[in-house]
């Protein structure tokens, strides 16, 4: 496992650990066992269709969760979500992609508080973690798999769920989600593996049965706040199959306002730098500007708790260099960060062009409170 994957593994799990235990200690504990099956999504190429036809995805999943039932502001706003950890494993070792497995943190958010007391309820979920035990591309041993170039990858799963209450202790759940394995172009090829499984699970509450608060919370009125965000991005990038990996990084400056508990939004600038251009193209000469790109970026931060937030960005380049595989005039960003105090934060995002990964941004941020 290389350095980036070690960082990704520890960061993803520590984020969810803090998300679970940093706020309060009152939970309804539960475990769930599930079976899932569904198609691997082809990218439309001949080799992609070949792998899709060869992989009949079937897997087992185990989760341990904690529904937050303390009557706090964020618990109430997110309708008493369930958070926890899970392990997923395919049932078969496929010749083309190996035996994908993952360890992840998850968050399930109901669509309504009233629905939690009904026999049938609905919600949505996200899973974030580390995928491993994949069989990567090899020009001799596995030339067909151009989806993934590394054994260890980032893992994400997003979807919707429906829950049917069997008893006070037991629920049946069905969910549909999009699973994605990617190394963020740290090692090519990296088209990414996408799966669209149906998951059927049995959920069992542990210990005493604790009800969610019956009284609505009087949420304090939110005053408008503003912030300056400084960010340092670091990562690695592989440009061609079999070539070395190079450093990618950058700096960001954003001005944000916080009109509501759940989000901040604003505008800023990003400066990116790409190492290795002289090594990749020794016959050419490059200026500092050739090795950099500059962009205006709109930012939206989804606040999950007082500490955890999801940064989402859409940037437009003022200038860029296509030799650095910045293939479009705009880029997207999404990730997760943990705020250690009112100022310092750390986390990881993925920067992409038209949903095609550019690099994983391991980020250190510093926030300064603006005028109220």
Feature map (PLM): residue ranges:
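Repeated loop/turn-to-beta-strand initiation elements of outer-membrane beta-barrel proteins
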Residues: 71-73, 166-172, 208-211, 261-265, ...
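Residues on the lipid-exposed face of transmembrane beta-strands in outer-membrane beta-barrel proteins
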Residues: 33, 62-66, 105-111, 126-130, ...
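Outer-membrane beta-barrel "beta-signal"
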Residues: 194-214, 338, 357-372
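Residues that define the transmembrane beta-barrel architecture of outer-membrane proteins
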Residues: 27, 54-60, 79, 97-103, ...
């Amino acid at each position: 496992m290389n350095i980036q994957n070690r960082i990704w593994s520890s960061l993803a799990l520590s984020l969810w650990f803090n998300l679970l235990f940093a706020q309060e200690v009152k939970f309804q504990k539960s475990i769930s066992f599930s079976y899932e099956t569904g198609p691997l999504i082809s990218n439309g190429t001949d080799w992609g269709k070949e792998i899709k036809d060869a992989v009949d995805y079937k897997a087992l999943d185990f989760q341990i969760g904690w529904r937050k039932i303390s009557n706090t502001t964020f618990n109430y706003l997110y309708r008493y979500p369930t958070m926890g950890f899970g392990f997923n494993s395919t049932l078969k070792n496929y010749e083309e992609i190996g035996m994908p497995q993952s360890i992840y943190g998850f968050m399930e958010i109901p669509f309504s508080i009233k629905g939690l007391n009904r026999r049938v309820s609905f919600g949505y979920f996200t899973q974030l973690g580390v995928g491993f035990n994949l069989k990567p591309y090899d020009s001799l041993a596995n030339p067909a798999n151009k989806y993934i170039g590394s054994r260890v990858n980032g893992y994400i799963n997003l979807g919707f769920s429906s829950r049917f209450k069997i008893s006070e202790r037991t629920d049946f759940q069905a969910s549909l989600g999009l699973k994605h394995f990617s190394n963020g172009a740290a090692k090519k090829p990296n088209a990414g593996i996408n799966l669209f499984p149906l998951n059927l699970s049995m959920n069992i509450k542990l210990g005493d049965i604790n009800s969610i608060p019956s009284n609505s919370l009087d949420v304090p009125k939110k005053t408008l706040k503003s912030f300056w965000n400084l960010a340092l991005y670091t990562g690695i990038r592989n440009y061609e199959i079999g070539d070395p990996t190079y450093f990618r990084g950058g700096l960001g400056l954003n001005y944000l306002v916080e009109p509501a508990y759940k989000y901040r939004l604003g505008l800023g600038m990003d400066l990116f730098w790409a190492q290795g251009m002289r090594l990749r193209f020794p016959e050419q000469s490059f200026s500092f500007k050739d090795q950099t790109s500059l962009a205006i970026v709109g930012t939206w931060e989804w606040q999950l708790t007082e500490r955890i937030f999801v940064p989402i960005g859409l940037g437009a380049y003022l200038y860029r260099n296509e030799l650095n595989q910045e293939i479009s005039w705009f880029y997207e960003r999404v990730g997760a960060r943990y705020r250690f105090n009112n100022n310092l934060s750390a986390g990881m995002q993925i920067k992409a062009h038209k949903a095609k990964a550019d690099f994983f941004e391991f980020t250190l941020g510093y926030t300064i409170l603006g005028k109220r």
